[in-house]
């Protein structure tokens, strides 16, 4: 693989955070002049390498904006079902939980909702030590999507009712843009 392909792969893997120039120089074992030359000669049909300060980021070209906006709009129309929202709330406040625990709380089979939440990356199944079962818990993506740093930041019944209403309003209006 040539250096362009390696840079592209590294920046793709780094995602929105990009990579610091020093990291690229170190990994590629090249000097700054060679890196600048590689970046300026990089060509791709839909991607571009941009520099922000000392950080390089792989991003889409401006010409792709209308298509990307259309994709985002389509994804924003994919809301979570009421069952998925209920299941997510139960898991968030009571984690870790087994599927049977969720069904006891909801009073109905929740397999479909659990599958949806796992597919969206909002929850994950972890192996329970010394057992063949799994426990469901929220993911870091859940925290990111709902704008909280840690699970303890969820509003509690002791907190202001308006804050809880706002949180659950945001939860219910969650567009499902989790990929």
From Swiss-Prot:
In the UniProt record, does the keyword Glycoprotein occur? Answer: no
Taxonomy, top ranks, is: Bacteria, Bacillati, Bacillota, Bacilli, Bacillales
What function does the entry list?
A: Participates in chromosomal partition during cell division. May act via the formation of a condensin-like complex containing Smc and ScpA that pull DNA away from mid-cell into both cell halves.
BP term (GO), one: chromosome separation
- Tell me the Pfam families matching this sequence: SMC_ScpB (PF04079)
Tell me if Cell division is a UniProt keyword of this record: yes
The protein's organism comes out as Staphylococcus haemolyticus (strain JCSC1435)
Keywords assigned by UniProt, alphabetized: Cell cycle, Cell division, Chromosome partition, Cytoplasm
Q: Which family does it belong to?
A: Belongs to the ScpB family.
Q: What's the name of the protein?
A: Segregation and condensation protein B
